[in-house]
Regions:
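Specific aromatic-rich, kink-prone transmembrane helix
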Residues: 41, 89-95, 126, 130, ...
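Membrane-interface helix-boundary signature
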Residues: 1-12, 72-78, 113
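Transmembrane-helix motifs of polytopic, lipid-linked glycan transferases
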Residues: 10, 77-106, 125
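Hydrophobic transmembrane alpha-helices of multi-pass secondary transporters
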Residues: 8, 12, 37-39, 71, ...
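Extracytoplasmic catalytic/substrate-binding loops of multi-pass membrane glycan-assembly enzymes
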Residues: 24-36, 46-60, 73
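Aromatic- and kink-enriched transmembrane "portal" helix at the membrane-lumen/periplasm boundary
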Residues: 23, 68-76, 104-113, 120-141
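Transmembrane signal-anchor helices characteristic of membrane glycosylation enzymes that use polyprenol
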Residues: 2-30, 124-125
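Membrane-water interface at transmembrane helix exits
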Residues: 19, 24-25, 58, 62, ...
């Protein structure tokens, strides 16, 4: 069933990232996002305590997506990408927990486990606070 887990992970990532890309903030959003965008572009230090990993990875996205004109959109893409990865991680962790609770499920239980983990991860991706952080340059979801 590892192959099914991989297929479901790819489907989940694609669906979640697709929705995030459809609703992504194309320019500079409000609050701290502008600071994170400018620091990702210039490798600056945002307000204390700083977020060095987010800034370095955001800078990597700025450089990879050089063909996109808006720097803000490039950093917002980083947040959407890492948020979609978070959904996949939640799915994989849920499956690991299900396997620990019931190491030898029958076929029907296994289908229920996969469906539950997939739907939980999918729906959790669209909770208000998670979705809001996923479509703008914010540090919460990449962390």
């Amino acid at each position: 069933m590892k192959k099914l887990e991989l297929v479901l992970s790819i489907i989940l990532f694609t669906l979640v990232l697709g929705v995030f890309l459809y609703t992504i903030t194309p320019t500079l959003p409000f609050w701290d996002c502008g600071e994170f965008i400018s620091c990702s572009y210039s490798l600056g230090v945002p307000h204390p305590p700083g977020t060095p990993l987010m800034i370095l990875l955001g800078n990597m996205f700025v450089k990879i997506f050089f063909f996109i004109k808006e720097v803000a959109l490039r950093v917002n893409l980083f947040s959407a990408f890492t948020s979609a990865l978070s959904a996949v991680m939640l799915f994989l962790i849920s499956m690991k927990v299900f396997r620990r609770v019931n190491p030898s499920p029958d076929r029907q239980e296994e289908i229920v486990n996969y469906a539950t983990a997939f739907l939980t991860s999918f729906l959790a991706s669209f909770l208000y606070s998670f979705w809001q952080s996923a479509v703008e340059a914010e540090v919460y979801n990449p962390a």
